[in-house]
Amino acid sequence: MANPLYQKHIISINDLSRDDLNLVLATAAKLKANPQPELLKHKVIASCFFEASTRTRLSFETSMHRLGASVVGFSDSANTSLGKKGETLADTISVISTYVDAIVMRHPQEGAARLATEFSGQVPVLNAGDGSNQHPTQTLLDLFTIQETQGRLDNLHIAMVGDLKYGRTVHSLTQALAKFSGNRFYFIAPDALAMPQYILDMLDEKGMAWSPHGSIEEVMADVDILYMTRVQKERLDPSEYANVKAQFVLRASDLNGARENMKVLHPLPRIDEITTDVDKTPHAWYFQQAGNGIFARQALLALVLNSELSL
């Protein structure tokens, strides 16, 4: 049947309705269970990373290859005409779009991915991260992992820990989970890195329950998902960072009293906010979460590049 995501730009998680999200996640589950190595056999996809990336770039490019697509692109703009000759982003995208069927793009500037859609013609642009703004495919793999481990995306208790002010992953994930009913949010962060007011206002408008907390221990017994993030040293003065760093570290001993099926997630890279002894517990799920990026990104590529998709 025809799908609503065909040739659609995916720049923000808000570009996807609840039905769209369910379609992507259902497609991801099918591709995980039944690989389709020739689904995009005659497609060419540009992987345009204007800033360095490890997991996102490798995950996207692996997804492309495993669906049979041809991949062109670059992992650093320094050696492109844009980096060396001063070509504009508009011209770069205008040219690349004449070569390929889709563009996957990461850029350090907020709004760059949305700008690219103005110059890509009918070629869909998939945002792989634009500054501290949006990272929709990270949110898709987060949702896929939550649904896979909890069996649902509604009536969940979700704690988010660390840098909630600048962390684009927690902004997008909160916006996505707010599309599903009955979810409750616990925000655990220092005052200087608290969740932005616009996110809290959005939750209030939707009638979603949320509360701020000063420690992980306060909520451990109540949550289904503990979503950890890295507190960035450069965001705080040295004395405050030392306090915060110690306060927002998860250790295996902190998991005593957690719900049996509670999962710890993290967008990675992890520095020292999750100690390695957590890795050995059944709650640790961040490496499986990263692996699910393959299937979430495969699903999105398959949907934007096929007017009809039957798996």
From Swiss-Prot:
Swiss-Prot/TrEMBL catalytic activity: carbamoyl phosphate + L-aspartate = N-carbamoyl-L-aspartate + phosphate + H(+)
Molecular function terms, GO-annotated: amino acid binding; aspartate carbamoyltransferase activity
The enzyme's E.C. designation: 2.1.3.2
UniProt name for this protein: Aspartate carbamoyltransferase catalytic subunit
Organism: Salmonella paratyphi C (strain RKS4594)
A Pfam family per the record: OTCace_N
Binding annotation for L-aspartate: 85, 168, 230
Top EC group: transferase
Gene this chain is encoded by: pyrB
Lineage: Bacteria, Pseudomonadati, Pseudomonadota, Gammaproteobacteria, Enterobacterales
Record keywords, A-Z: Pyrimidine biosynthesis, Transferase
UniProt-listed NCBIfam families: asp_carb_tr, PRK00856.1
GO cellular component, one term: cytosol
Ranges in a coiled coil: none
BP terms from Gene Ontology: 'de novo' pyrimidine nucleobase biosynthetic process; 'de novo' UMP biosynthetic process; amino acid metabolic process
Function statement: Catalyzes the condensation of carbamoyl phosphate and aspartate to form carbamoyl aspartate and inorganic phosphate, the committed step in the de novo pyrimidine nucleotide biosynthesis pathway.
Subunit and partners: Heterododecamer (2C3:3R2) of six catalytic PyrB chains organized as two trimers (C3), and six regulatory PyrI chains organized as three dimers (R2).
Family: Belongs to the aspartate/ornithine carbamoyltransferase superfamily. ATCase family.
Key word Signal present: no
InterPro entries attached to this UniProt entry: Asp/Orn_carbamoyltranf_P-bd, Asp/Orn_carbamoylTrfase, Asp/Orn_carbamoylTrfase_sf, Asp_carbamoyltransf, Asp_carbamoyltransf_Asp/Orn-bd
Keyword Transferase tagged: yes
Residues reported to bind carbamoyl phosphate: 55-56, 106, 135, 138, 268-269
Pathway(s) the chain acts in: Pyrimidine metabolism; UMP biosynthesis via de novo pathway; (S)-dihydroorotate from bicarbonate: step 2/3
